[in-house]
């Protein structure tokens, strides 16, 4: 354990950079920008209940409108957001550190050779302290919630994905999620299941059903639940 309740199975510098990422949401049909410096403000955080894990913090993370733009329904959608999920307390930890400049990328004068920034220090100092041990599992948790009208009824679709490290092979959950998806897409291209060329979009060009079935064969399952809401 550590005060962050977080260890990294990918690039720690990337985690630090994500704490400064600007976000664009659609709220009540209008685009709303959340600058990176306001990402961890209490007003921008909410809690979600993830099956099997309990309460997690949802923190603004990136341009949600990008996805609705690509799928062609930004003009009709009412609300959309994109969040990182973390254990409770993540935002409260980073909020004061960001305010004090610990994630600035400007070198600090008279510190070493004058080329070291606070971000550099946070990266080099913390990264080796946040490494998983051989008997520890990393977790990948994804939650997607969609609400709309289906067959004349207001409906909510909840899709969840949960991956954990395989201690027998040592393969990290993050590695499994990223690598398996890339391998499946590459095989689809080789087998002509995807005929388009050039830069492709997972949202548009990858056949959903065979892709999800291939993930399932590798132990990665997306669970979907539909429920009818009161009008």
Where are these regions (language model features)?
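C-terminal catalytic/substrate-binding lobe primarily of soluble NAD(P)-dependent oxidoreductases
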Residues: 1-231
């Amino acid at each position: 354990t550590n005060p962050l309740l977080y260890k990294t199975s990918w690039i720690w510098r990337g985690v630090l950079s994500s704490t400064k990422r600007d976000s664009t949401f659609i709220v009540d049909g209008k685009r709303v920008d959340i600058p990176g410096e306001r990402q961890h403000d209490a007003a921008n955080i909410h809690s979600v209940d993830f099956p099997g894990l309990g309460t997690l913090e949802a923190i603004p993370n990136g341009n949600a409108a990008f996805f609705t733009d690509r799928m062609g329904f930004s003009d009709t959608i009412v609300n959309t957001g994109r969040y990182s999920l973390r254990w409770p307390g993540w935002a409260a930890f980073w909020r004061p550190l960001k305010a004090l400049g610990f994630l600035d990328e400007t070198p600090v004068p008279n510190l070493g050779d004058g080329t070291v920034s606070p971000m550099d220090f946070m990266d080099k100092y913390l990264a080796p302290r946040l490494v998983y041990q051989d008997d520890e599992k990393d977790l990948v948790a994804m939650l997607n919630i969609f609400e709309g009208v289906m067959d004349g009824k207001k409906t909510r679709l909840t899709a969840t994905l949960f991956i954990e490290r395989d201690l027998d092979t040592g393969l990290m959950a993050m590695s499994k999620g990223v690598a398996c998806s890339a391998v499946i897409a590459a095989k689809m291209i080789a087998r002509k299941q995807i005929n388009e060329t050039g830069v492709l979009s997972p949202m548009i060009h990858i056949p959903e059903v065979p892709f999800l079935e291939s993930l399932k064969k590798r132990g990665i399952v997306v669970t979907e639940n539909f429920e009818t809401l009161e009008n």
